[in-house]
Amino acid sequence: MADLKAFAEQLVNLTVKEVNELATILKEEYGIEPAAAAVAVAAGPAAGAAAAEEKSSFDVVLKSAGAAKLQVVKAVKEACGLGLKEAKDMVDGAPSVVKEGLAKDEAESLKKTLEEAGAEVELK
């Protein structure tokens, strides 16, 4: 186990030139494509952990309507395709989940729309 940790430490500390040399050796002698090897070595364990933890779906949570409650109700109504009463109930019941399972760009867009209307919004 100690040998593997030492090996991992050496991989993480490689320079760009050394990574390129390693990629060449892996391709020529072992048939491993250099792009996959270079990415794996250059990323290191910290970057790999961060990529694994990055979420692919987000929930948009309305924390509060703020001072412009009417504008927020209208924005929620439009964004969710709800009736006026349902949108008002959602805003009145804050904190509440406006939409679940959105892609990051969709969630950011909805968050921006609601914040422009005056709401306090959080992505989870």
UniProtKB/Swiss-Prot annotation:
GO terms for cellular component: cytosolic large ribosomal subunit. GO terms for biological process: translation. The keyword NADP does not apply. One of its GO terms (molecular function) is structural constituent of ribosome. SUPFAM superfamilies: ClpS-like (SSF54736), Ribosomal protein L7/12, oligomerisation (N-terminal) domain (SSF48300). Keywords: Ribonucleoprotein, Ribosomal protein. Transmembrane segments: none annotated. Coiled coil: none annotated. Homodimer. Part of the ribosomal stalk of the 50S ribosomal subunit. Forms a multimeric L10(L12)X complex, where L10 forms an elongated spine to which 2 to 4 L12 dimers bind in a sequential fashion. Binds GTP-bound translation factors. Belongs to the bacterial ribosomal protein bL12 family. Forms part of the ribosomal stalk which helps the ribosome interact with GTP-bound translation factors. Is thus essential for accurate translation. This is Large ribosomal subunit protein bL12. It comes from Bacteroides fragilis (strain ATCC 25285 / DSM 2151 / CCUG 4856 / JCM 11019 / LMG 10263 / NCTC 9343 / Onslow / VPI 2553 / EN-2).
